[in-house]
Amino acid sequence: MLLDGAAATEFHKLGYEYGGSQEMWCLSHKEEVTELYRSYIRSGAGAIYAPTFSASPLQLAKYGIDTEEKYKETIKALVSLAADAVRAENADVIVVGDMSPVRFENDGLTFWKMLDIYTDWAEALAEAGCDVLIAETMSSMEECRAALLGGKKTGLPVWITVTADDEGLTVPNFSDTSVMSCLITLQAMGADAFGLNCTPVSDITAEMLGELREHADIPLIAKPSAVRGYGGKNEVGAEEFAAFCEALADEGADLIGGCCGTDPTYIKAASEAIFSKHIHFERTRSDSDELILANSRQLFFLSPDCIESCPPLTCNLDMSDELLELEDTNYDVIAVEIISAEDAFSFAENEHMANLPVMFRSDNEMALRAALLAYQGRAMIDSNCAIESEKLEQIAEKYGAVIY
């Protein structure tokens, strides 16, 4: 599927000033915004992103949108700008509810607060009639997981895309988050698609997508930028961009569009380049039975036949000594005993010091849920517990965990 192109840089051409509220500007320039979407549809886009990228409850509250009723009315008005374009073109095009990182201007947000924000945001987008939800330009595992968990409550498909540097880390990076760790964790949790956006037209971007494809069980998204730096000048033209999109399709991208600096001419060129050559990527899956676990920083590949875990750690507020000591051992997995929700929260405060994958053991269903919810990665669950197997499987599926 072909996605649309840039929003903010195109709005800027129409008079929007960077630094102001993009959403408030859109609502005062409805005809121009809808016409931009119509242009993307005519250029071949099969999905358009509603102009809700920075429309979180926190951001809109700064402009007097400070009640639930006002918020949902505003989101509905914004989504209608995209929906009106679809109706005007009588097109079979999906409307994607767009969500952004929330830490850019709110660095002190906890994971729990982010989860509340994305839950409310996703609910408003779903009620406004979006077909799909996306959280894009994401910069940390915490944000990605909060957006996915909040979005899945609506029952709509949820896509996640991150922006990456040349080292395969998300940017701006708050916690050395690995793009590959995001893929493994999020697809296990039920993300419907994952990928990259606002990355440059470069060989490294294409190679990164190819590496993701090796471990992807879900569709991959690629929405590269044609500029470096917000509000910068175009560095690549439409023809070069289209050729790059063709290369991304060769690497296995399933959904392709453009980010900053790409206008409808770029999307049209990409459409012609991709669909005229009938590119079809054949997925190949590895026969390996390796278990893949992750924290926010790295992946861990384990053979299910020979996993040795440490004696279960007891949770407390400071686990630094215990976790650091494990680095000099031959254990494959850190076993963590979770007796209560307090244990789950205590370990969450210490997990950044764990350089091995984690296995939670608990006889308490709610405590186990809390531990998996708070853990920023893909964990393992010890099957030797008092929780019924059917319930354990339900918990593992929700949080993307591996039962062992």
Predicted feature locations:
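Domain-level signal for soluble alpha/beta catalytic cores
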Residues: 1-404
